[in-house]
Amino acid sequence: DAGFPGAILRAIGLRGETVDAGHGPEVRVTVAAGEPWDAWVSTCVDRGWAGLECLAGIPGLVGATPIQNVGAYGQEVAETIRAVRVLDRDRGAIITLDARDCRFGYRDSVFRRNPEGFVVLAVTFALRPGGAPTVRYAELAVALEAGPGPDGADDRDPAQRPSLAQVRQTVRRLRRRKSMLLDDPADENRRSVGSFFTNPVVTPEVAADVEARARALGLVAPRGAAIVPQFPAPDGRVKLAAGWLIEHAGFARGQRHGAVGLSSRHALALVHLGGGTTAALLELARAIRQAVLLRFGVGLDPEPVLLGTTWPRP
C-alpha cells in the first residue's frame, strides 16, 4: 500500500530462444527470461516437446519459473531445467548455475532463499521430442480418463494415450474451473496470485498428529480409510492439503472479508474484490494461518513473495 524502498525490473526486453538438439533423446532450449510462460508452453506442445505440458495456463514470464520451482498437475520446472543464466549481484558478473546449484525444492530454490542475490536472464530446459505426456496427478488423470502412475507412465497402447495437446487443453480447462486463468475479466475470482499458501510438508509424526486432531474434532471418520488428504514428499515426509486444512479451520470458499476474500472455487486462492488493500489481504491471510495453527498445529507459509512486509514464522 505504501510501496517499498526498491525498484522492480521487468524482463520484457529479454526475448528469444536458442535450440541445441545435440543431446541424444533430449532437445535443450535456452529461453530468455522475458518470454511469456504460457505461450512458451504452447510452443513446446506444438513442436511435440514433452516436459512442460501440465504447466499450461500459468501467468508470468519464463524467468520467474525457476525462482519458486513452478509446479502444477504433477509437473515441476525442476524436472526439465538444466541451467539458469543469472546476473550475480554480489559478484557483479553473469554466471550460469546448473540444476544442482539452483537447489530446487517444493516451491523453493536458491533464488527464492536469496531474493536480492540474482537476476534471472535465461533458462535452459531439456525436453523430450515425441515424448509422452506426464499424467501422474489424479485429478488430471480422471479428466483424461487415464490411469495415473507415480512416474507419469501410461501402459496403454500409444494410440490410446492422450496427446500433449490434449493434456495442455485439459489442464487449462481444470484451471478455468478454479478461476486460475486470467482471460475472463468478468470472473472476480481470477483476481488473485493463484494459491496463496503452499501445502505444508511435515514429518510423519506431525501428519499423524493432524489426523488425530481431525478425528477428535469429528472431521474425519474415527476409523477406516477416510483421512486428512496427504501425499508422499521427499525424504520420507508428508505433504498435507492446505486447502483442506483451511476449509476445516472455519474458512469457506466464497467467504468475504470486506474487499477481499476466499475464491468461491478454490480455498487456496485469496481474491481481491475491488477497492481493497494489501493490509486487508494480509490480515485475512494471517487470520487463516492462525486458525489452521490453532486447530491442527501446522503453520502455513505464503507462496507469493511478499515485499515490504513480514510473515509470522511457526
Residue ranges and their predicted role:
Residues D1-R91, I95:
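Anion-binding (especially nucleotide phosphate/pyrophosphate-binding) glycine-rich loop
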Residues I94-A279, R295-P314:
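Phosphate/pyrophosphate- and phosphate-bearing ligand-binding catalytic cores of soluble enzymes
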